[in-house]
Amino acid sequence: MSRVCHKLEDFMRQRRIAREIALQVLYSLEVVEMEAGEAIELYWAHYEAPMDARPFSSLLIEGAWKHRDQIDSLIGGCSANWSIARMSKVDKSILRMAVFELCFCEDIPPKVTMNEAIDLGKVYGSENSGSFINGILDALYAKIHKKNDEQEIAPPPERSE
């Protein structure tokens, strides 16, 4: 296997670890009232985490928590039969993290974000979490792209000579 492939595998592994850490911290923020930064510092103080995973974990945690009202509104708009309050804390945490990635992390392909979230749901959620998360993220992704497709592109200004 080439060096490039190994680096890519390492990068993907670090991203997965970062998402798992973010899930744990976001879940804890659902249970214990504190600031995201404080929760992150507590995690680093009590659990081992690769240094390479920390910046991305922190980005996901702080971003998802800071924008949670906006994110929850987006999730709620794609889950007709489930209010955000009825969702499990694990599913809600995974969805918040994934929606943050979809909306704010343009360098991450949406399908990667969605697949990672579905995998986390299968591992850490209930037996139906993977398909539940998939359904909501698919609907949200379709809404985002439909909205982008409907935006008119302004014609270039006419040149004056």
Swiss-Prot record:
**GO MF:** RNA binding
Q: Which GO terms describe its biological process?
A: DNA-templated transcription termination; transcription antitermination
The protein's superkingdom reads Bacteria
InterPro entries this protein is in? NusB-like_sf (IPR035926), NusB_fam (IPR011605), NusB_RsmB_TIM44 (IPR006027)
User: What does the similarity note say?
Assistant: Belongs to the NusB family.
What function does the entry list?
Answer: Involved in transcription antitermination. Required for transcription of ribosomal RNA (rRNA) genes. Binds specifically to the boxA antiterminator sequence of the ribosomal RNA (rrn) operons.
Protein's name according to its UniProt entry = Transcription antitermination protein NusB
Q: Can you name the source organism?
A: Syntrophus aciditrophicus (strain SB)
